[in-house]
Amino acid sequence: PILHSKDLVNWKVVNYALKELVPTDFYATVQHGRGVWAPSIRYHEGEYYIYWGDPDFGVYMVKAEDPAGEWSEPVLVKAAKGIIDPCPLWDDDGKCYLAYAWAGSRAQINSVLCVAEMNAEGTKVVGPSRIVYDGNDDVNHTAEGPKFYKRNGYYYLMFPAGGVQMG
C-alpha cells in the first residue's frame, strides 16, 4: 500500500503499487514468508520508484509519476535466489547503483551486503556485485536492510547489524 499523511500522525491508504505479485502463477495461492520483502521508495527525475526483494526470484522495481496514480508493471532488475532488502542510489554523475542483502534461508549466506551498478534507468543490474560489508565476524551478525545515500561527496550505507528479529 501507498500511504499519505499531512502531519506524520494520521495516515491514509491512497493507492497500491502492485496489483498482484509476480510471477502470478506462483502467487496464485498464499505463500507465507514469500513475496515482497523490505521495499525502498525513492524519488528521481520526476518519478517515484519502489524496489523490493523477493527472496525466491530476485529484485523487482515499479515506478510512477504520481504515487496516487498508475504504477508500472513490475520489472525484474536482478534475478537471483536469496537477494533481499534492495535500495537504489542515483549518483550525481548519472550512474545508478543497487545495495542489497542476502537471505540465509534462500542463499545459505547472510550478513553480507553488496552493491552493483545498474543502468541509468534503474531497471537492470549491469555490473558485477561487490561485497561492501561482511558481518560474519560474530560481532555484527545478521546485517540486513541497507539504505544507501550520498551526501557532501560521501557515500553512506546504513543498516541494522544484529538483525531485526526482535522488532
Name what the model sees in each region:
Residues 1-167:
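Carbohydrate-active catalytic/glycan-binding domains of CAZyme proteins
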